[in-house]
Amino acid sequence: MKIRIGHGFDVHKFGGEPPLILGGITVPYEVGLIAHSDGDVVLHAISDAILGAMALGDIGKHFPDTDPDFKGADSRVLLRHCYKLAMDMGYSLSNLDVTVIAQAPKMAPHIEAIRAVLAEDLASEICDINVKATTTEKLGFTGRKEGIAVEAVVLMIKS
């Protein structure tokens, strides 16, 4: 059995108009994230992790922010595209672990809904998807509520 690990990281700055979209769901918050696409920092980190595991570069290579076709793009569509590339190479998701780093908004009320979206988009069981959140104890840009950072790790197995 061939196994591949991918790590993804993404950051977006607060300041855009609502909605705030995280993990494919709308999270109530007074501002959105500034981005070329819909700004879903969670799905961007996961997409990067999948592309990394497959040695296919990153989301900037596949969906450049200089391309007007991706202006306001739905990050769920981008994630499904990245996962299809992996499936076309004969791989499927074994498990996913995501860490959302944000002082605000509070993520706990939204984690199960995000897990359900991810399980659907990645054709996986919800028990193979973990999403957790942490703060930086008011330190750094996330602690000052200037933005959100996300790390994602995927384990992909050859089908």
UniProtKB/Swiss-Prot annotation:
Keywords: Isoprene biosynthesis, Lyase, Metal-binding. GO terms for molecular function: 2-C-methyl-D-erythritol 2,4-cyclodiphosphate synthase activity; metal ion binding. Binds 1 divalent metal cation per subunit. GO terms for biological process: isopentenyl diphosphate biosynthetic process, methylerythritol 4-phosphate pathway; terpenoid biosynthetic process. 4-CDP-2-C-methyl-D-erythritol 2-phosphate binds at residues 10-12, 36-37, 58-60, 63-67, 102-108, 134-137, 141, 144. The record marks H36, T135 as: Transition state stabilizer. PROSITE patterns: ISPF. Its EC number is 4.6.1.12. It catalyses: 4-CDP-2-C-methyl-D-erythritol 2-phosphate = 2-C-methyl-D-erythritol 2,4-cyclic diphosphate + CMP. Pathway: Isoprenoid biosynthesis; isopentenyl diphosphate biosynthesis via DXP pathway; isopentenyl diphosphate from 1-deoxy-D-xylulose 5-phosphate: step 4/6. Its cofactor is a divalent metal cation. Belongs to the IspF family. Homotrimer. Involved in the biosynthesis of isopentenyl diphosphate (IPP) and dimethylallyl diphosphate (DMAPP), two major building blocks of isoprenoid compounds. Catalyzes the conversion of 4-diphosphocytidyl-2-C-methyl-D-erythritol 2-phosphate (CDP-ME2P) to 2-C-methyl-D-erythritol 2,4-cyclodiphosphate (ME-CPP) with a corresponding release of cytidine 5-monophosphate (CMP). This is 2-C-methyl-D-erythritol 2,4-cyclodiphosphate synthase. The lineage of its organism: Bacteria, Pseudomonadati, Pseudomonadota, Gammaproteobacteria, Alteromonadales. The gene is ispF.
